Amino acid sequence: MTGVAVQTIDHVTVAAPSELEDAVIEWYSQVLGFERLAKPEGTSSSGAWFRAGNVQLHVTIEPAPPARVGHFGVVVDDLDGAVEQLRAAGSGIEPARTIPGRRRCYTRDPAGNTIEILSYDGVTDA
């Protein structure tokens, strides 16, 4: 094997402006159901850290609007149920191009960061 021997992804970071800090933290905790973690000593008091499975999500608070490039994806067992819950929470759903063997769509957190929601149970989109 060539290159760096990466073992896994440890965390993904998304940014939010300070005026949306509470809304973004609540969204990841209440809407997506991520487990909120205690932040290590020496890190910023703003923002929050979460865990979903073996990967962490770090929310940082930035003075400028966050970049709208890229996204991260989360796997769910029931895409239709997840879409229903996201819509009930007021989150928009954007369709995604079909990829064989998976169903998927996109949503955004209150700061506009894009999250792909996917399941490996079919080939049609939400």
Feature-to-residue mapping (PLM):
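Residue-level structural signal for beta-strand termini and adjacent loop
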Residues: 42, 62-63, 120
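Core segments of cupin and vicinal oxygen chelate
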Residues: 14-56
